[in-house]
């Protein structure tokens, strides 16, 4: 019997990326409390733990599936930055990132049930933001786009206009490193191709 593929995420970006790959999958909200925002913990451990928590939670109800979970954070000056809590927080984050490099870490976990085998990996990318103006920050916040994104920007949307350059996996910055995900799926005998 073919296993159902489940994305343990509410992220529209992750959903769009898997759809773009032509994957037949179901979206299930993991309903877990993510850890790490604003903390000085290891971003690698934070995104790994959050991705694993998501697949394990969904696995409780899906016992013949391939479950995919991911978590993404932005790190600057050792601070883990998740999604902004409000517009004031988005403004603070965008000011902190302005004209500087930061790192984006995504943890991706794949769990096969009923075997309950979990594979997890972390991808890191480096992003340099432009020295954008206060007016640009205000216009960007007014779009609403920063509010549900780690680091208060979406590189796949208008946030791309704030970015000067990237080093590493673009899809990692969007929130789902597809090449690494495919590598994990390959180890379980599946493929995005």
From Swiss-Prot:
Cofactor(s) annotated in UniProt: a divalent metal cation
Major location category of this protein: cytoplasm
Compartment(s) of residence: Cytoplasm
CC per GO annotation: cytoplasm
UniProt keywords, alphabetically: Cytoplasm, Hydrolase, Nucleotide metabolism
Origin: domain of life: Bacteria
Pfam families given in the database record: Maf
Cross-referenced InterPro entries: ITPase-like_fam, Maf-like
Reaction catalysed by this enzyme: dTTP + H2O = dTMP + diphosphate + H(+); UTP + H2O = UMP + diphosphate + H(+)
A single GO BP: nucleotide metabolic process
Active-site annotation: 71
This enzyme's EC code(s): 3.6.1.9
Keyword Hydrolase on entry: yes
GO molecular function: dTTP diphosphatase activity; UTP diphosphatase activity
Site (Important for substrate specificity): 13, 72, 156
Job description of the protein: Nucleoside triphosphate pyrophosphatase that hydrolyzes dTTP and UTP. May have a dual role in cell division arrest and in preventing the incorporation of modified nucleotides into cellular nucleic acids.
NCBIfam families tied to this protein: maf
Family the UniProt entry places it in: Belongs to the Maf family. YhdE subfamily.
Protein name: dTTP/UTP pyrophosphatase
Organism: Dictyoglomus thermophilum (strain ATCC 35947 / DSM 3960 / H-6-12)
